[in-house]
């Protein structure tokens, strides 16, 4: 019996598998744009478990499953027994008998790992406080479709060393690029996988200009992520000087791309003239969530495809 593959963090797949996913995403995006039908998942069902609200995650997975010929079911804490304390292990046992694949967006990475450990079908991490692999998968594809391989490039992260930043670090190690992180004291990137990352993979600084200098990608996120609202005032003060401005973008390469996972707060972590400017690819990132997730779902359920 073939073992079930899950996608719980970026390091779960190999460079060759990512190369396949990027090429497959390109094909699926082109087909969708041309109006071609590609429905290899007719009769397949995805259960989507949400403990954290979302716009892009829900819409991209629902639309993606529909385009592949399958169906996606939405479950949240109000409409399921999860909100009443049912163990996630029991939820996994039930959902994996009625679904072909599960996506979960929640708070704790440990919850996702427990779900996967008791599931008969693939589990995809739609977001946790620790990692956001589907977002970074889409971000890197957005770079790849414009400039080719990201290997040997430099990505600058300005702001909170959060789940997206932590996922960028895993991606740097897997795909061979460098991540430069600028964060204020107390909000630095904390690795959780026990790995030591050399200077060829990770550089940390307090200075945004140093991080952005010579970068191919400049990216950031909100200062206060979901679940940390009580810290909003303290965070706003701590992150003063960490806004991505047009002046800061001048430190990057002229062809550098600006990325943001959204939702964005103009005038806080990014200036309006940057996110709405010519170097910004945030809307392409959002769309590409759907395309890369389609490729990922197809790969986890059907394996390597060339059709």
UniProtKB/Swiss-Prot annotation:
Entry EC number(s): 2.1.3.3
Protein residues bound to carbamoyl phosphate: 54-57, 81, 105, 132-135, 261-262, 289
Catalytic activity: carbamoyl phosphate + L-ornithine = L-citrulline + phosphate + H(+)
Subcellular localization(s) per the UniProt record: Cytoplasm
Organism domain of life: Bacteria
Record's keyword terms, sorted: Amino-acid biosynthesis, Arginine biosynthesis, Cytoplasm, Transferase
GO molecular function: amino acid binding; ornithine carbamoyltransferase activity
Binding site for L-ornithine: 163, 221, 225-226
Cellular-component GO terms for this entry: cytoplasm
Record-level GO BP terms: arginine biosynthetic process via ornithine; citrulline biosynthetic process; L-arginine biosynthetic process
HAMAP family cross-referenced by the UniProt entry: OTCase
Family: Belongs to the aspartate/ornithine carbamoyltransferase superfamily. OTCase family.
Entry function: Reversibly catalyzes the transfer of the carbamoyl group from carbamoyl phosphate (CP) to the N(epsilon) atom of ornithine (ORN) to produce L-citrulline.
Protein's UniProt name: Ornithine carbamoyltransferase
Organism whose genome encodes this protein: Chromobacterium violaceum (strain ATCC 12472 / DSM 30191 / JCM 1249 / CCUG 213 / NBRC 12614 / NCIMB 9131 / NCTC 9757 / MK)
Source species taxonomy: Bacteria, Pseudomonadati, Pseudomonadota, Betaproteobacteria, Neisseriales
